[in-house]
Amino acid sequence: MKKCDLDYTQSICDALNTLRQQKPLVVNITNYVVMNNTANALLAIGASPIMAHSQEEMAEMMSFAGSLVINIGTLDSVWIPRMIYAVEQANANNKPVILDPVGCGASALRTNTARQIVALAEQLTIRGNASEIIALAGEQAQSKGVDALDSSDKAIHAAHHLATQNNCSVVISGATDYIVTTTATIALNNGHEMMPYVTGMGCSHTALTGAFAAIGEPTGLAATAVLGIAGEIAARDAAGPGSLQVNLLDTLYHLDEAVLREYIRINLVEEGCH
């Protein structure tokens, strides 16, 4: 492992320790399908989740929360103004915004709403699958509803465009996960092939990204490593997706620095690292 890869590993370990000390509050405007999954993932890693969808309380919430997670999985016309207002309040309070553009490219409503949030958020991290990232950037994507048909490496160019145009970090989920910032592209090769068979796994990834952003790690690197490693370990004793989901929460809860260092497979794809 190169020195710069070791430096990234140390930063991931430090971020996990800090998160558990600070227990940040993460405001989630997320979809009906995954609220329970994402709340449990946040609790297991050491954060404090709240599912707040009311516009009337959002100014108060964002005044003391650590970050805002927006997930457009069950989007409708009622939710959109609430999401926009929440982003405005996050901006007003200098708080990071994490966007999960679920199904971006599958409909004009999803694509336009996601792009509106990207344009508005001042401290932004985007986490999506390859097809969502490609569509969000305005390129031609292949998707089936909310599922990606593009491999994660096919979205790197689109992620670079989004990161550069919006001064943000972009996380591409897939068999290999990529973290794309304005200065580096990092590949992580953890996780397990069973993980896509658990609904809300990507949404949990986004929520964890919000937890780490709340303590000053907005790139998505720590969240991606933590979830990938936890999923890999949880799958060892899982008979199928059902037991994987339960095992994952237990593994997140018990995850520590020694396990992170043992399992992490990280590679700096692009930057001045020799």
From Swiss-Prot:
CDD domains: THZ_kinase. Its EC number is 2.7.1.50. Substrate binds at M51, G200. GO terms for molecular function: ATP binding; hydroxyethylthiazole kinase activity; magnesium ion binding. The keyword NADP does not apply. It catalyses: 5-(2-hydroxyethyl)-4-methylthiazole + ATP = 4-methyl-5-(2-phosphooxyethyl)-thiazole + ADP + H(+). Keywords: ATP-binding, Kinase, Magnesium, Metal-binding, Nucleotide-binding, Thiamine biosynthesis, Transferase. Its cofactor is Mg(2+). Catalyzes the phosphorylation of the hydroxyl group of 4-methyl-5-beta-hydroxyethylthiazole (THZ). HAMAP family: Thz_kinase. Belongs to the Thz kinase family. This is Hydroxyethylthiazole kinase. The gene is thiM.
